[in-house]
């Protein structure tokens, strides 16, 4: 139930962001300061409090169609989550998440900042899992774990804690203690370039996953996809203005420029020949393609009225 509610909230957050789109300038880079281990191939950050207290998001969630068992309002959703885990999600400011997406057994961690009571948080977790957490001294940190040794928890400070699979938690603590090097390279570069935004994510995808993303409609050679070092995406909202950015980072500026030219051609082709509603064509015209270093950059700018018209047109097509 809670997972379903959270997923709906995140979906509405993205929709609300796109609905208000109107800013095309990229934000300045923001460095990654959290202890992210080298094993990770994905890094993401979410400004939790900003999203959950945004008036447009609240309105979008409250008006969205929901299943009968879903909370009617975002206030009800927050209360249900607090009743079950003992914490109001709006008390969390930011979550920086990392993972190894290719690990079949699961490898992930989340560094969360906010206002919370350490003892109360531990009690709530123990009550939720039905067992007591054990703790050891790990690099001077008190590292908690469940009985199976699968998941871990550690408090960096009064307002920051680390939670995740035990191996990911310990790897992060190794980095924090200076016993291991942090994640570096294209994924971090792409993540930092996305700047201070609502949501930002950067990931290294295998070529087969890139092929799934592009599909048959986008004529990009497999050799080019093999040279994609990182894929980044971000969403930022300021007032009624939101920017959506996608960065495809390759091994050289030449490849990035070539991919930009291909995508411009694809955009033009769809605008002229695809059987799309006029509203969709209008939004496609708002897509701006450029190159920044070795990255092909896609920016989308649209007004609330254009997106509303597009949503209505899509609904009419489905009917």
Which residue stretches match the model-derived regions?
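Solvent-exposed coil/turn segments that connect beta secondary-structure elements
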Residues: 49, 113-117, 158-159, 166-168, ...
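Secretory targeting signatures
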Residues: 1-27
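An internal, short helix-loop-strand segment that often contains or flanks glycine-aspartate motifs
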Residues: 45, 55-89, 132-241, 245, ...
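Short amphipathic alpha-helical linker/capping segments at the junctions of internal repeats
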Residues: 176-188, 265-271, 315-319
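An acidic-aromatic pocket/loop used at catalytic or ligand-binding sites
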Residues: 44, 151-167, 293-298, 303, ...
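Leucine-rich, highly hydrophobic segment in Treponema pallidum outer-membrane-associated proteins
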Residues: 27-28, 200-313
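Long, low-complexity, Ser/Thr/Gly/Pro-rich intrinsically disordered segments that act as flexible linkers
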Residues: 26-130, 134, 237-241, 288
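Short Gly/Thr-rich strand-loop-strand
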Residues: 68, 115-156, 256-294
